[in-house]
């Protein structure tokens, strides 16, 4: 999809851009694959804020996405490419030959009328899903499982892709979008191709209201809060932090502190860290 640039007819329109939605073929979703979605506004079951800067926004239906792709040897035809308000990638409605309908993440280059299939014997074509052990070295993939049968968990955002680097016993070496090289079981499935809608990250919202439509609330600096709201708060005028190092709103060190569990069992599966040269 291309980027649409607006003329500066108002202050809010100045520098505003949006996607032109040229790839979208319908604006009416498949009703049988919709479920209601209640806005949580970043609250947990006690009503306390657990994720800040969330709330409001347009009402949405959740689209049930098939991340497992486990209907082996059953062909499906792509019927539509659709917008999904719950994710950055577009989705594709596919009709299987046995009558089942499903949504999948739409990879770049997938077109209406194209046939896709899942299973170990599937061809290396965009949209086909197969075990990592059956995918040739150098192939770009997305929607990667971490545990066989659990469904794709990695590389699902717009424009994202990972590359198969080789096989090592029962594991497959995969280079992720971040640059991290990781061993994943060869029986885990992945879908061939790059996630579509790669222009998504280039959109300039242009005004605060568009963030509010998306359910994103303002992010306030700690230095302009009161001392009871943030460790950086208080003081006369533009006061410095007043601590040895910047802190989170809960008093923990911010900026540069490693938050990954030092005893994570998956450490042994990481061949190269994302920040290693």
From Swiss-Prot:
Q: Short name of one Pfam family for this protein?
A: Ribosomal_L2
GO terms for MF? rRNA binding; structural constituent of ribosome; transferase activity
Mind listing the UniProt keywords for this protein, alphabetically?
Answer: Ribonucleoprotein, Ribosomal protein, RNA-binding, rRNA-binding
- Repeat found in the keyword field: no
Question: What spans are recorded as compositionally biased (Basic and acidic residues)?
Answer: 264-277
Q: What Gene Ontology biological process does one annotation of this record name?
A: cytoplasmic translation
| Signal peptide (UniProt feature, chain positions) | none
State the SUPFAM superfamilies in the record.
Answer: Nucleic acid-binding proteins, Translation proteins SH3-like domain
Q: Name one GO cellular component term.
A: large ribosomal subunit
Q: Please give the PROSITE patterns that the UniProt record associates with this protein.
A: RIBOSOMAL_L2
- Residue ranges, annotated region (Disordered): 219-277
InterPro entries per the UniProt record, alphabetical: NA-bd_OB-fold, Rib_uL2_dom2, Ribosomal_uL2, Ribosomal_uL2_bac/org-type, Ribosomal_uL2_C, Ribosomal_uL2_CS, Ribosomal_uL2_dom3, Ribosomal_uL2_RNA-bd_dom
Q: Keyword Transcription regulation: yes or no? A: no
* Function as written in the Swiss-Prot or TrEMBL entry: One of the primary rRNA binding proteins. Required for association of the 30S and 50S subunits to form the 70S ribosome, for tRNA binding and peptide bond formation. It has been suggested to have peptidyltransferase activity; this is somewhat controversial. Makes several contacts with the 16S rRNA in the 70S ribosome.
Q: Tell me, how does this one assemble?
A: Part of the 50S ribosomal subunit. Forms a bridge to the 30S subunit in the 70S ribosome.
Q: So what family is this one in?
A: Belongs to the universal ribosomal protein uL2 family.
The protein in question is named: Large ribosomal subunit protein uL2
Gene name of the record: rplB
